[in-house]
Amino acid sequence: MSLLITEKQNQAAGDFVDLIAGRLGSGRAIHPETAIASAARISGSLLLRSFGFDLGSSEPGTALLSNEANEKGPALISLLGAFLAENQVSLDPTKLRGATEHRGTEPNLTTLESLSLLQAEALAVAARHSLSLQQAAEAAALATAFIVKECSASIGGEVGFNVAAFGFVEGSKTVPPRLEEVVKPPASKPWYKVW
């Protein structure tokens, strides 16, 4: 499968990687599962925003199930898989659980914490590169795939794939925080760890 990504999306993907590294890590040292989940959640959330739903009328964190997410969400997972295949990240199909569950270390941020921390800047990346919300979701999925590739040596490609697939679903089916709201991680829980 060939990746059909525009140059603007490729540039935006680099900005998304920099955003994740800058907001979640110290330098470029970040907790892999948290970085992957956060990038995937942003991708899914951008896709959710592309559907044009009135998100302000629902409580942030509420599940928002839709046919649109069911139809368009799998494209994000396909993009992830295609990128990993093109970059020779081998995956054992028996260890892939996709969007149903992921095993390994849990991300250190909840879905709402991830979105609150990143969504305003993610929307700014989309605007800066003149991308539609769906194009931005694809660019963020590409960024997620890059992070999975970079972390595969330490956590395994399958763990990265599973965390990402679950994050795409979380982002595309969760009402995001309102842009003016900020959800802070609990002070007692570290939000990163050095590899």
What are these regions (language model features)?
Residues 1-195:
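Solvent-exposed interaction surfaces and binding hotspots enriched for charged
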